[in-house]
């Protein structure tokens, strides 16, 4: 059984600065980290490996220069995957979900897999599209919002997903793609032994040409800015007469 778990490198939100003059965001001092939602996907894949015993877990990512960071690669591998595959090119820096999914699908097809696990969304965009788009690109079953994996055999996967007023139990044939929610597990913190052992695990670096892609259209970000801050207003209406009540109602209407 070969399981691929996909992840994305995103800027650490704690290090993103805001320019007070125009509200633009400064990412220059922000280190990259694994998207928080993808930590659940990595943990889910590694838990399946422990249950099955003979499974192989491959971490996979598509992106730009952030994927060249040795510390970031070590962080991923210290969380349990046996191997790492990264597809690196400048055109993936600002790729749309559809283009990211196209590249992941091509890389997964080249690597081979039985099950592909994604996070619910990325910490930066949270488009919640990539997992389903990968399934569409590969023409295989895809389920999002998975909150529990009930069973996995050589041919079938059974999962639960929680909807607003019900819990679905779904069985799909393999190969398949699932996107897991944050309810599925609590990602573990890597031990010192795992961190040291991560340096010995294999890393494959591919280009778009290696997976059969010539170019992927990317959008151009004209500006990224924080919303303007509004001062909190405090309106005090004294009295309980009809005029005061009318004024109170009028102020409520303004904020509803």
From Swiss-Prot:
- Which Pfam families does the record associate with it? ETF
**Listed disulfide bonds for this chain?**
none
Q: What family does the Swiss-Prot or TrEMBL record give for this protein?
A: Belongs to the ETF beta-subunit/FixA family.
- Give the UniProt keywords, A-Z: Electron transport, Transport
One annotated GO biological process: carnitine metabolic process
Matches recorded under InterPro entries? ET-Flavoprotein_bsu_CS, ETF_a/b_N, ETF_b, ETF_beta_N, FixA, Rossmann-like_a/b/a_fold
Which pathway does it take part in?
Amine and polyamine metabolism; carnitine metabolism
Protein name per Swiss-Prot or TrEMBL: Protein FixA
- Share what the entry says about its subunit structure, partners included: Heterodimer of FixA and FixB.
Q: Which PANTHER family match?
A: ELECTRON TRANSFER FLAVOPROTEIN BETA-SUBUNIT, PROTEIN FIXA
The species this protein belongs to is Salmonella typhimurium (strain LT2 / SGSC1412 / ATCC 700720)
Relate the protein's function as given in its record: Required for anaerobic carnitine reduction. May bring reductant to CaiA.
HAMAP family noted in UniProt: FixA (MF_01055)
| MF GO annotations | electron transfer activity
